[in-house]
UniProtKB/Swiss-Prot annotation:
Function comment: An essential GTPase which binds GTP, GDP and possibly (p)ppGpp with moderate affinity, with high nucleotide exchange rates and a fairly low GTP hydrolysis rate. Plays a role in control of the cell cycle, stress response, ribosome biogenesis and in those bacteria that undergo differentiation, in morphogenesis control.
Phylogenetic lineage: Bacteria, Pseudomonadati, Pseudomonadota, Gammaproteobacteria, Enterobacterales
Family, similarity comment: Belongs to the TRAFAC class OBG-HflX-like GTPase superfamily. OBG GTPase family.
EC number(s) stated in the UniProt entry for this protein: 3.6.5.-
UniProt keyword GTP-binding, yes or no: yes
Keyword Nucleotide-binding: yes
Gene: obg
NCBIfam families associated with the record: Obg_CgtA (TIGR02729), PRK12297.1 (NF008955), PRK12299.1 (NF008956)
Domain Obg intervals: 1-159
Subunit structure: Monomer.
Name the record gives this protein: GTPase Obg
Family matches, as PROSITE patterns: G_OBG (PS51710), GTP1_OBG (PS00905), OBG (PS51883)
Class of the enzyme per the UniProt entry, highest EC level: hydrolase
GO annotation, cellular component aspect: cytoplasm
Source organism per UniProt: Erwinia tasmaniensis (strain DSM 17950 / CFBP 7177 / CIP 109463 / NCPPB 4357 / Et1/99)
OBG-type G domain span: 160-333
Length: 392
């Protein structure tokens, strides 16, 4: 299935049903009073994370989603039926952005997480709502409000613990094939990897972590060269980056310069991503003798000003891979996910009609002074005979 990590959709919540103007009419009850019911609320639009999905390709073809309209109110104080909600399923890791305001509505970071993205219109009020001591036969009602409409930008960001970083042909896909059941394509030409892939590294029955492999970066990626930097966003939620360096590049390029290219493109893309924990991993040591591999790695680390531990591995024959994976596992256990990676929603998503009803009632209802002598209740005595209104 084609991997699509961005999509734009239109969501429209259902309109609210209109209120009803109606009066009770029965035999022997000529002036039965108002009995117009309220309309039904419009249906809402929800997004839900589904771990069984891994692409947004469906939303390249189906771009519009509309919830059901609420029914109009009816006589006999019958309230209209509420419109049905709709549920849009997206992969876990999807970020939802309102295109109109640029506001991030939320990140869908765990299975079955559900979030409202468009609120249905409020129901209109029937004329029964406007009955008062000075208006016994109200003929006003309110119309249902339109459902909220939003253009949403969906961005899928892979949820992984470890991110692979490096130039094309550095051995990132070979590493993932060696440590997990993932089978990304591996070949001896650049840009074999065209889309991100995930692999689960299971250390034992109770310990595992997820590795993300993205297409390799080249110089000028921040300006769109190669595959650009559009896939770097998939590393934003990783806890550690494995910067993979080819010790014996097939094009005989300088590994130090290659490493600096990656660091430069990373810094241009995001300062936050640049500051993430990053480990140096020297790959393809099997192409050199042991002493030469160690001396090259040491020289590269010194040229980069690297003072921390680095790793020498051969992803092709798994030399040094197991020790690296156990160190990664220990790091992940010692460094739980950042607070922002846990489902963090805005304190409150503002919707259009939150205060609508209160305002409508305040505007439509006249202020009346309280008078204990005035019979302001509609009772059976009022219904059985001719109504007489006394004025002072």
């Amino acid at each position: 299935m084609k991997f699509v990590d961005e999509a734009t959709i239109l969501v429209v919540a259902g309109d609210g049903g209109n209120g009803c103007v109606s009066f009770r009419r029965e035999k022997y009850i000529p002036r039965g009073g108002p009995d117009g019911g309220d309309g039904g609320d419009g249906g809402d639009v929800y997004m839900q994370a589904d771990e069984n999905l891994n692409t947004l390709i469906d939303y390249r073809f189906e771009k519009s989603f509309r919830a059901e309209r609420g029914q109009n109110g009816q006589s006999r104080d019958c309230t209209g039926k509420r419109g049905n909600d709709i549920l849009i399923k997206v992969p876990v890791g999807t970020r939802i952005i309102d295109q109109g305001t640029g506001e991030t509505l939320g990140d869908m970071t765990h299975h079955q997480q559900k979030m409202m993205v468009a609120k249905g219109g409020w129901h209109g009020l029937g004329n029964t709502r406007f009955k008062s001591s000075v208006n016994r036969t109200p003929r006003q009602k309110t119309m249902g409000t339109p459902g909220e409409k939003r253009d949403l930008q969906l961005e899928l960001m892979l949820l992984a613990d470890v991110g692979m970083l490096g130039l094309p042909n550095a051995g990132k896909s070979t590493f993932i094939r060696a440590v997990s059941a993932a089978k990304p394509k591996v070949a001896d030409y650049p840009f074999t990897t065209l889309v991100p892939s995930l692999g689960v590294v299971r250390m034992d029955s109770e310990q595992s972590f997820v590795v993300a492999d993205i297409p390799g970066l080249i110089e000028g990626a921040s300006e769109g060269a190669g595959l650009g930097i559009r896939f770097l966003k998939h590393l934003e939620r990783c806890r550690v980056l494995l910067h993979t360096i080819d010790l014996a590049p097939i094009d005989e390029s300088d590994p130090v310069e290659n490493a600096r290219i990656i660091l430069g493109e990373l810094e241009k893309y995001s300062e936050k991503l640049f500051q993430k924990p990053r480990w140096l991993v020297f790959n393809k040591v099997d192409l050199l003798d042991e002493e030469e591999a160690e001396s090259r790695a040491k020289a590269i680390a010194e040229a980069l000003g690297w003072t921390e531990k680095y790793y020498l591995i051969s992803a092709a024959n798994r030399a040094g891979v197991n020790a690296l994976c156990w160190d990664v596992m220990a790091f992940i256990k010692a460094n739980p996910k950042e607070a922002e990676l846990v489902a963090k929603q805005p304190e409150k998503v503002e919707f259009m009609w939150d205060d609508y009803h209160r305002q409508q009632l305040e505007e439509a209802q006249p202020e009346v002074e309280e008078d204990d002598d005035w019979d302001d209740d509609w009772d059976e005595d009022d219904e059985e005979g001719v109504e007489t209104i006394y004025q002072r």
